[in-house]
Amino acid sequence: MGKLLRKPLNERIAPGVTLVQDINQGNSPLSYVGFRLIELEKGAVYQEALTDLECCIVALTGKITVSEGDDIFAEIGTRANVFEKIPTDSVFISGGRAFQVKADTEKARVALCYSPANRDLPTTLIKASDNSIEQRGKYQNKRLVHNILPDVSGVASSLLVVEVYTNGGNFSSYPPHKHDRDNLPAESLLEESYYHEINPEQGFIFQRVYTDDRALDETMAVEHQNAVIVPEGYHPVGVPDGYDSYYLNVMAGPKRVWKFHNDPDHEWILERD
């Protein structure tokens, strides 16, 4: 199965560009989802040529300029810190195209989210104001959601991207749910990656990834800028008191539909008044 918890790499890959996370088909059990996290110093440039993958570039912190052909999106990004809890700007780029990202502020943190390019689509700026915002859950199961690329969006061919905030003392991705069977309309098959940040940064959260038969069952203490791979199974997150959690989810599979199945042992939680 491979290691599900990924610690920061912090590798310098170009002048002023640091690779923090790199998840791909070659180093993980995933077939549909890829993820990179890069940090750029002011003026530094990251370049990439896409082949059979599409990419959503998310300006996590700082301001960046994204260029693809004649399309230039200058000084996008809305936050100095993800825990400002406001939506940010993103750019979608289809397969077979080359792009570059340049940092316009002293530092910029950028997420690169990948999935198979099933058809050619226009390069698109996804403004912060385009994100739909949801407050989900109740009791100790509350979270704030920013939908960047939900399944109702026609911007991408296979990619789903969402940001989730969970306050201390709460659980999210909870009751535990999974989406690892191509069994629509009951359930869709979507792989998933989690990129985590924690406030304050010295904190940690817990994430469990498990299947019904427990053939896969890993519980991880996840720290700031760690990533977690979810090739299958349920994947709840618990946040200790005193710390806030942020994570960026990337999902993809054979069909661009998010339909999950709750763990029947814990679904009763939803039935409370």
Curated annotation (Swiss-Prot):
Keywords for the protein's UniProt record, in alphabetical order: Isomerase
Reaction catalyzed: 5-deoxy-D-glucuronate = 5-dehydro-2-deoxy-D-gluconate
EC number: 5.3.1.30
GO MF assignments: 5-deoxy-D-glucuronate isomerase activity; glucuronate isomerase activity
GO biological process: inositol catabolic process
Transmembrane intervals: none
InterPro entries: Deoxy-glucuronate_isom_IolB, IolB_Bacilli, KduI/IolB_isomerase, RmlC-like_jellyroll, RmlC_Cupin_sf
Annotated metabolic or biological route of this protein: Polyol metabolism; myo-inositol degradation into acetyl-CoA; acetyl-CoA from myo-inositol: step 4/7
Keyword Isomerase included in the entry's annotation: yes
NCBIfam families: myo_inos_iolB (TIGR04378)
PANTHER family listed in its UniProt record: 5-DEOXY-GLUCURONATE ISOMERASE
Function, in words: Involved in the isomerization of 5-deoxy-glucuronate (5DG) to 5-dehydro-2-deoxy-D-gluconate (DKG or 2-deoxy-5-keto-D-gluconate).
HAMAP family assigned: IolB
Homology family: Belongs to the isomerase IolB family.
The protein's name: 5-deoxy-glucuronate isomerase
Organism field: Listeria innocua serovar 6a (strain ATCC BAA-680 / CLIP 11262)
Gene name of the record: iolB
